[in-house]
Amino acid sequence: MLALFASIVILPFAFASCNDDETPISSSTPTTNKAECLTDSAKRAMVYSLTDLEGKKGRIYEMTYTVDYKLDEALQFGIDGTTKLRQFVALRLFDKLPTSQLPTLTYDAGCSAFACPDSRSNDYLMGRNFDFNHFAPGTTNREMIPVIAVHTAPAGGKKSVSFVDGKFVDYNQGFYTDKNSDLSMLMALPYLLLDGINEEGFAVSVLKLDGLPTKQEDADKPTIFTTVAMRMLLDRASTVQEAIGMLEQYNMCMDKEKASYHFFMADATGDYAIVEYTNADTLKHPNKMEALQGNDTLRCVTNFYVSPTMANTMHGINHSDHGKVRYKNLRSGLLDYNYKATPAQAKGLLQIVAQGPNDSQSSTGFTQWSEVYNLSKRTVSMSILREWGKTFEFGITQKK
């Protein structure tokens, strides 16, 4: 059973069986939105158990994912991008295909992240800002997201909590009770994570890079997409070293036309790493996996390549300005603290590099959430939208 440290208690809901077009019958369910593609009672009970952690604001929700999301099948499905991921969700997780077109599934991530020991204890911390701008099509009008915290406890796997930007499946703030949004795409949540932590204290996050997307094509390896990889790591990796070994067994494909990603990961032993896919010829897709670790300069990361392979390219550390100011501020702050920080100091570093509504209008220019992970205690303290005086606490029961 996942231990929940949020002050909101999730109440169990009771449901009668529904036909394809029925809305949930329980009077305690706050929504009348449909879930057209779901007929299985367990799936319907799950998607109708979403909890708004602020009551009725529609800004941050929490859900425990209680059915099988078929990770083994996902790892063999050849998911090389968002289109194939959407197909997997429709064919393997839905009970029937939709009568209308599925919502567009998109994916992106700006962000800043770092790892360090807690200066007042033996705990290890990871800090993370998720930065991303959503604009209404053809405008500069910002659309606000719902954050969704997703608890999972797969059979034979590790318990975890991960965090999703609901806008990537076209859910706006307040979608759950807007009487319009179909809830079927909540089935995709395990594969939409942007960061998370498991019961072993292993945490992983994804951050955007400029340039062509990663495309590995080893005929002897199955192909996986960014978020499928992260789901695999949270479900199966206990440490950074195990995670690196798992990634080496797969072709990584990232399908953004003009962007790629790198992973930042850390664990409860104090280990940390940046995993990048590189190619010094920027006219070709990155295809060589590199795990960068073992020195304090790699404790923080933003949105340019840190690999020496990429250093002198336009997207590398010597020439790219994408996230450079944030990176320098993180490096400087960590150095001032001698690469150790209390949770409050870690939060302060996130505040320094957070981006507000008057900052960059680029895709990575708006901080949606900020987290201090305690990898030793398996907890996450989150603030949304730079509301630093208000936090949401999440946790996982530690492995015995």
Residue ranges and their predicted role:
Residues F13-S17:
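C-terminal motif of bacterial Sec signal peptides marking the signal peptidase cleavage site
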Residues G245-D255, F263:
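Secretory/export targeting leaders with adjacent low-complexity proregions
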Residues I8-V9:
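Hydrophobic alpha-helical transmembrane segments of integral membrane proteins
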Residues E257-A311:
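Extended amphipathic alpha-helical segments with heptad-repeat/coiled-coil character used for oligomerization
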Residues R231-L234, I244-L247, R331:
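Non-transmembrane alpha-helical segments in soluble domains
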Residues M314-P343:
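Long, charge-rich alpha-helical interaction segments
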Residues M1-F5:
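Bacterial N-terminal signal peptides that target proteins for export
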Residues N19-S238, M252-C253, L335, Y339-K400:
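N-terminal mature-domain region immediately after signal-peptide cleavage
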